[in-house]
Amino acid sequence: MEPKEATGKENMVTKKKNLAFLRSRLYMLERRKTDTVVESSVSGDHSGTLRRSQSDRTEYNQKLQEKMTPQGECSVAETLTPEEEHHMKRMMAKREKIIKELIQTEKDYLNDLELCVREVVQPLRNKKTDRLDVDSLFSNIESVHQISAKLLSLLEEATTDVEPAMQVIGEVFLQIKGPLEDIYKIYCYHHDEAHSILESYEKEEELKEHLSHCIQSLKKIYMQEGKPNLLDMGSLMIKPIQRVMKYPLLLCELRNSTPPSHPDYRALDDAFAAVKDINVNINELKRRKDLVLKYKKNDEDESLKDKLSKLNIHSISKKSKRVTNHLKILTRGESQVKDNTFNREEKLFRALEKTVRLCVKNISLCLQHIQDAMPLALQSVMDLQEISYNKDDEMDYSETLSNALNSCHDFASHLQRLILTPLSALLSLFPGPHKLIQKRYDKLLDCNSYLQRSTGEESDLAKKEYEALNAQLVEELQAFNQAARKILLNCLCSFITLLRDLMLVAQQAYSTLVPMPLLVSSISEIQNQVLEEIQNLNCVKENSATFIERKLSFEKKKPVQILPEMPHQTDIHRSKLLSTYSAEELYQAKRKCNATQEYDINLLEGDLVAVIEQKDPLGSTSRWLVDTGNVKGYVYSSFLKPYNPAKMQKVDAENRFCDDDFENISLFVSSRPASDSVTGTSESSIGDSSSSLSGTCGKFETNGTDVDSFQEVDEQIFYAVHAFQARSDHELSLQEYQRVHILRFCDLSGNKEWWLAEAQGQKGYVPANYLGKMTYA
């Protein structure tokens, strides 16, 4: 027996070596390129499948036998004992019966699917009842029918006109396992929902009557064909689930009935593992769905009794462990399992939620503002039309205005329908995934807790629940984020399009009202002309010199225009003035005066000038037209004093107190800080356009006490040279000679022409050249 056993083992090794060579060249792969194919004449709905002709099958069978018989059957015949040969024959006979059962049951199953589609699904769809959702009831039953027809076709092709010893069934299932799993996953995933929908339909008489009519017609066909009687619609809907669960049983039995030396044994082993994995994956998918439905249930749906029933020692212990593990993770005392894919999708999910919420809020506010502003804008247009109304113009703009108002209403309705409604519906879908994400984190904490303590059933259960919930979230969050992003982008594009259309309507209406659009330069010229006309009015002439336009804090400071430098006054110029003008017309500059406006001139302290006119073109008496003997221009009168050489010394002695005390009081102080402007020399006097106040000594009473107190005054104390009326809440009104305390020598933008002052408890901005520094000798 030992030589025979050794020979048998060698033959087994030889067969295993040849199996890899033969498997890829069996009934499907070894075909000639010139094989003739004909349509199957088998009756049934799968008649469109392609089959080999009889001559090609015979030739293919002969070639397969030539390859396997010399190396297989001869060797087996030499080594097998009569008992083993008898056992193998029994196994082959049983194998043949199982293959026939597999094919026959697949035919019956396919026939049931055909009847279901023809007698139930199609008639219900043709009724087009709104309350009857056929797709939700039967899911992808047509796809199940197609994959069953394909499987049956491949099984028949692998067995027809092929010797039982040469039939390979495992390769058929390996070839079709991918589509088989995808299709049955969808059907099994929706079966529970379909069953619930069926129960709800059976409660409505009209829908129940439609379903009963289809079932009765189907029962008649079953009775005519001699099949077992169909119980109800539920038993018909569960057939695909029963069938996919039966494939592993049939393949397992077929593998056990196949000799190990048979070329189909290894393929059957792989096919059995494949269909078993299909069932495991389907069950896992269903379990994941059940977990999602369990944790997705809103707390509002639970009664107080249900919530109290969950409160027990186990739940309290579990929650306390979660808190402990969470604190450990926060303090980095314990590592956490990370899923980068989930973290990325969760981050995108939260960003999308925030974006959608802000879009709903901001677009709603935008719509509200547009609706509020449109009537006001139309009223302004009508007022401007009335102002610019020309009697010769007989055009009627009422139609244009009504069209603009209608466009606003259309904009609001389209915005609500195309943007706000979809975004609001999308926003309402975020709480469900939020709750599942939180549950997923809880399950992760449970999993970490059990893994640290034990590896028992509780640990395995916690790990399975976490992995199931995590896999479900990763899969569905990707689909949800992709769909949410697409909806969001479409809504934003629609919003931009609606705004563009509204602006185009407004532009067309404007072009109708104003045929020729004005250029920016033309608008500036018109504005300047209007301002000049306003300044010529008597009511504004007096205040035109003190009119100062305050610059806002966010505006950039305009560059100061550099005026051309003028030559200094010489003795020749003085002689010319003395010989040309009378003594009453001659004045002398009390201090240096710099030009601040157009047509102003610069003066040095002691320069002699002749006053030509004691007002400027706008009628202001604060600026005089003077002649220096070299040039003519405007100078502020406060910088000048009468010229009288005979009384100069006497006037200086009499006015020593007044002039010395107020010589350094600047009417138009510089924008420089006080620290730079405390000297009394002409070169360092305060401001580029400073002046002293003459003839005001009598308005100030001085004694020893007052002088001492004034000397103790902070250097930040100034007084108002001119009265200033505030034009906004940010400015401070001042009376003439009113004392003010300077808080800051510039505004928020750094503009030193406006100072922040405080007077009588009020704060505000004041023009710098309206203030004078209070200094005393």
UniProtKB/Swiss-Prot annotation:
Residues 35-72, 673-694 are annotated as: Disordered. Residues 582-645, 713-776 form the SH3 domain. The keyword Repeat applies. The keyword Lyase does not apply. Residues 679-694 have a biased composition (Low complexity). Residues 94-285 form the DH domain. Residues 37-52 have a biased composition (Polar residues). Residues 327-536 form the BAR domain. Pfam families: BAR (PF03114), RhoGEF (PF00621), SH3_2 (PF07653), SH3_9 (PF14604). GO terms for cellular component: cytoplasm. CDD domains: BAR_DNMBP (cd07589), RhoGEF (cd00160), SH3_DNMBP_C2 (cd12141). GO terms for molecular function: guanyl-nucleotide exchange factor activity. Keywords: Guanine-nucleotide releasing factor, Phosphoprotein, Repeat, SH3 domain. It comes from the Eukaryota. InterPro entries: AH/BAR_dom_sf, BAR_dom, DBL_dom_sf, DH_dom, Dynamin-Rho_GEF, SH3-like_dom_sf, SH3_domain. Residues 53-66 have a biased composition (Basic and acidic residues). The modification Phosphothreonine is found at T34. May act as a guanine-nucleotide releasing factor. This is Rho guanine nucleotide exchange factor 38. It comes from Homo sapiens (Human). The gene is ARHGEF38.
